[in-house]
Amino acid sequence: MIENDKKKNIVRVIEALIFASTKPVSAKELSPYLEGFELNDIIEIIEKRYSSDSGVQLQKISSDHFAFRTHPDIAARLNLERAVERPLSRVAMEVLAIIAYHQPITRSEIEEIRGISLSRGTIDILLEHDWIKPRGRRRTPGRPLTWGTTINFLDYFGLSELDDLPG
């Protein structure tokens, strides 16, 4: 009985942590609160709680991040006021797509694919949005920096994993 109460409390804590976060929460961030329980078991309980009769659902992003999102069947009925974001330039979207499909990729490889040089500002804009991040260095002469997408990229574009990209 005590173990069951403890598990219920852990479920509530994990649920609150995910709910209160503005960004997807990683399994690593949740693990200190599990007190010996399995995260998958806790997540399963939360998913059942937010089944089809709820306005929100727990979404798994990538393989180990979680976020609450509006249930798809009512999303169209909601009209939320948001700060208007300036749309990305065509070049920035093109570079983001190249990074998403070819990651990890170096700046020179991006330029080779595009056939034109890449301005530092384009990378800066994608970094500001937290859609890309450095992924390490190639073991080639000059040790160029490689780029890849982030969890926030997946979240913003409604993807669970990179395999969900079209094409």
What are the residue ranges of the model-derived segments?
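Short amphipathic alpha-helical interaction segments
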Residues: 37-45, 113-131, 141-144
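A short, conserved structural fragment
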Residues: 48-60, 129-139
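Short, amphipathic alpha-helical interaction segments positioned at domain boundaries
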Residues: 74-89, 151-167
